[in-house]
Amino acid sequence: MAYITKRGNSYSVRYTYEDEHGKSCDKWESFPTKEEATNRKKQIEHELAAGTFLIPSSVTVAEFLMDWLPKQCSKHKWAPKTYESNLSTIQNLIIPYIGSMEMQKLKPYHMENLYTTLSKTPCGSYIEGKKQELTEKQKQRFLSGTTIHEVHRLLGTAFQYAVEWGILVKSPVPVDSPKKSTQERTIWTVEEMRAALDSMEDPILHLAVHLTLVGALREGEIVGLTPEDLDFDAADGIGTFRINKSMQRVRKEALNQVDDGCIIKVFPDKLERSTTSLILKSTKTASSCRTIFMTSALKEELKKWLNQLAADEMKDPARYHDSGMLFRLPNGLAVEPVLIRKKFLKWQDAHPEFPRIVFHGLRHSSATYQLMISGGDVKAVQGTTGHATADMLVNTYAHIQQSSRVELGKKFESGFYAKPDTPSPQAVPAAGEPTISMTALLELLKNADPEVKAQLRLALLT
């Protein structure tokens, strides 16, 4: 039951409710007119009778999210990077803008205003929740639609829990999500991949890129390899390497929050008071665990690399720190993913004739090339790339090469404009050229067994 009391020039509604602990509490709400107070009284009595009454709460968005995050991490057994990524989104993209607002005062238009603000916000404006001083150049790079979509996704999930926990009656997050960015990734052609590999003199970079091009690996998977993952005699001597681990550098705060079941090893800190740790963890999904065929050139390079590791250890055994990893510095310490990226950036600066791509673009290039030479055998390529679903592979890596579009245009012209009783014009092969058609060749490749496909990659990459 609710009561109205006139207090000076305003009207107060007093009512009693039970909090989350079952304790009886009195609440007063003030209104400027009797009509508003009467409407609120009726609303309260209806909600109390229907069991839909929302317990008053002054908890802020920041307080709720920082309470919700570790609970979700524990419930869903997040990997350290997942926790770190979500924490970063909350600290840098949500709390600075709506963190001080009370949850129960949030409306859908507040969410829309947040998305609009973020779309005009430069990247890196906040790091670990602290405002950053940006250069004029940095101020011109704004958050992408994909990043804002991720904010929407996180808030949508979090606020649904707020409804379940009785903090909100309804989530204020709009149903329509911000549009993701659709910028096409830059990739290399096979000629560019081969030429780039030939020009790389740094042994660590050369091996890392070679492995990526053959196996479409992620950065963490490359440096997560150990010598035990190599089998030079497998597949009738073709040789294979196994992907089942990944190396990452994560914040210690994230490491302390997650279930350590997926963590294989935490490497010793190089610096005192370090706020991050280098870890070796199992791959994120079952499909990420896979075996990849070697090429003969890669096989020989790996053997030479193992000999170099043994030689490095013999130079000064007392000061050698055997990390147990395949990628090591001359002193035995593990090579981190960031070092591979830095080496690749340095190489790109020295070779401006190649299209500028991020290191992960090599994985895209390899996957796209393998889709082409396999005649679109998505399942075979999926076994190499480790994508969870075939759709994910196709949607992410089905780049259209310019040469393929030109060939498609020629085929359309020869087929579309040909008269019904006139055979389509055929290109006349030059002397010494094979006469097998592209269609027949792709069909042969599609139906070939994995060993033949591995040998084909060997021929193309050597």
Residue ranges and their predicted role:
Residues 7-112, 128, 310-322, 402, ...:
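N-terminal DNA-binding module of tyrosine recombinases/phage integrases
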Residues 232-235, 245-289, 410-462:
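C-terminal secondary-structure termini that scaffold catalytic or DNA-interacting sites
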Residues 3, 17, 70-161, 182, ...:
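N-terminal core-binding DNA-recognition domain of tyrosine site-specific recombinases/integrases
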Residues 242, 250-273, 280-304, 321-344:
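C-terminal catalytic core of Y-nucleophile DNA break-rejoin enzymes
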Residues 123-127, 198, 202-203, 215, ...:
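Short, basic (Lys/Arg/His-rich) helix/loop patches that form interaction surfaces
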Residues 229-237, 375-398, 424:
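Short, polar N-cap/turn motifs at the start of nucleic acid-interacting alpha helices
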Residues 179-180, 187, 245-249, 385-411:
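Catalytic-site neighborhood detector that most strongly recognizes the C-terminal catalytic loop/helix
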Residues 127-145, 149-151, 164, 168-227, ...:
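Basic, Lys/Arg- and aromatic-enriched nucleic-acid-binding interface segment
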